[in-house]
């Protein structure tokens, strides 16, 4: 284990919906990659306890997905609130990356950042202000080379750790098949 300012922090949140003023975080996971997108550490996967009233505001899609994958049951039994989950996550990150150095990495992570700003401001502050958003590259591929999208199929787990692992794989796919950087 070595702190490296070039390591990348990947994050995924599962939420009860998309509006941070109404909805809440129900799961968080992080992992660390090196600059070549090799996973070097996986952080804690933490279901976050939420009161029943916060669970009840979920729309039908979220209820179905999170009941089917067992997340709602894990949330109901969790001993972690947002602050404790934030603290545990930061303790993990401090082992691998200095504060405010790594961009926030993942899929549609601007959405995650909105929730971090609302409910986990210390964690939000841990990241650099930049992003590496795999969704942006996917949108560019859709517009500039749509046939490439047929070659990568997502599993849509809607579980935080599985989703960020898949985001790393997806970015590797785009790196090799769409961005095609020349080796030095």
Curated annotation (Swiss-Prot):
InterPro entries: Exonuclease_RNaseT/DNA_pol3, Oligoribonuclease, RNaseH-like_sf, RNaseH_sf. Gene3D superfamilies: Ribonuclease H-like superfamily/Ribonuclease H. GO terms for molecular function: 3'-5'-RNA exonuclease activity; nucleic acid binding. Residues 8-171 form the Exonuclease domain. Coiled coil: none annotated. Keywords: Cytoplasm, Exonuclease, Hydrolase, Nuclease. CDD domains: Orn. 3'-to-5' exoribonuclease specific for small oligoribonucleotides. NCBIfam families: PRK05359.1. Belongs to the oligoribonuclease family. This is Oligoribonuclease. It comes from Buchnera aphidicola subsp. Acyrthosiphon pisum (strain APS). The gene is orn.
